[in-house]
């Protein structure tokens, strides 16, 4: 029974890409930033080859012989956000970045949004999600106007107090925004950002919901589903692909939940892909420039990893990668244009095998399709033959 568990450590980049200057990300290295913290400890990832990848060998312990195949992944797409990164992993290289709005959204778009929702809009500028409710939360509660804001990413975010706008109503407003954000304003994601509490102590709740663009063409997920395989989505994977190609999904509130849900799926019988996103690295620590928090989150994942490895079946393959960077040590709170890691591990996978630097994240999707004997219609070149034991 063939199974692949593909785990995305959201934002765990491993060093600036050659074009990082075009994105104002020179010098970014998310993993090395976290490694400077006293709370950083990843012996299990190290055993799998994490520090033997291109660009990280100065961190390697020469006594450790990696038990897995490993590589450094280059992002071929233009952009550095979650949607673009996950789409590329699944076989779509995006020639254009998704639109961003550093000056806020155009008046015509917001006029239509106000007309359709019956509520006014406040803010309309790039903002930190925690700061925006501090600065606009009181006005929102008093007037009922929706806090609409963006970031350096391609997002249209709507913050609302759950006591003012019931959660289902907020989700409906997001669906309206998703309908009208198209063409030049076709953001990658519309995001519901509910919060609660009393002024000035507002806090975001865990009922965030993302409304993504449909992928422009079929991905690895669609091909696996068409071929009769299960495609299980853990965390925000279902949202990132707007449900396209997913056969079963479970939402999670944090990394701990994501790990537990993945372990539950590991115990179940299925044939196909379990695609996991662990978001805390990015959402809770990277964007908030919390180096120690980031290090603790990586250490926690590393602590839990043996639970998964010990329960792997004969035909299981584990792949660990990332979708972009988000260096918590730089002045920027935004994503960073970085290489990402790839670890491939399983009973059938060679140890101590370095695949070097791959041209595109899409090689991952191609390798997964080849493992399931599904002829690929996606971009990317499979590395499966290079890492399978003969």
Swiss-Prot record:
Q: Which GO terms describe its molecular function?
A: magnesium ion binding; manganese ion binding; phosphopentomutase activity
Organism this protein belongs to: Lachnoclostridium phytofermentans (strain ATCC 700394 / DSM 18823 / ISDg)
Matching PANTHER family: PHOSPHOPENTOMUTASE (PTHR21110:SF0)
Kindly give the SUPFAM superfamilies that the UniProt entry links to this protein: Alkaline phosphatase-like (SSF53649), DeoB insert domain-like (SSF143856)
Per its record, how is this protein called by name? Phosphopentomutase
Q: Which gene produces this protein?
A: deoB
- Name the keywords, alphabetized: Cytoplasm, Isomerase, Manganese, Metal-binding
UniProt-annotated binding residues for Mn(2+) 2: 282, 287, 335
Give the superkingdom in one word. Bacteria
